[in-house]
C-alpha cells in the first residue's frame, strides 16, 4: 500500500482544503492526512472511494484501533458520491466514533491547558491547534457518543 503523505499530493483537493482551513503547507507532513486510491480506501475503511484519509490517535500519539485495524476516516473525492445529500466523511461500518487529537497537540500541551476546547472536524482541530489553541476534534455534532457497546454512550476515550 502506498504511504504517500498529503505533502506529496501537490495541489489536490485535500491539499487545498488544508490550506483553506488555515494549515500551512509546511506542516502537512506532520499531520496524518494522505491521499488514497479506491483500493486503499477499501482496505482502510471498507468503502471503495478515492479521496483522502486521516488517522486518529490518542493524545500520546498511539493510533486508535477498530477490530485490530488502524482507525481512519475517509473524505471521498466529490465526484465519487452520488445522491442529493451524500455523507462528507465515512468511517468503517460499526466502528463508532473516536475523538481526534491533532498530532500538533501533545499530551503535555493538553495537560497545561486550563480549559478544554472541542470542535467539529479534524481540519479545524489541526488549524486551531497550529494557531495556539489545542482542540479536540469530534466527527460531527453527535460525535461525542457512539454505540460500540450496544447503547448510545459518551465516548470512553474522552
Give the positions of each predicted feature.
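Short, small/acidic-rich helices and loops at N termini and domain boundaries
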Residues: 1-56
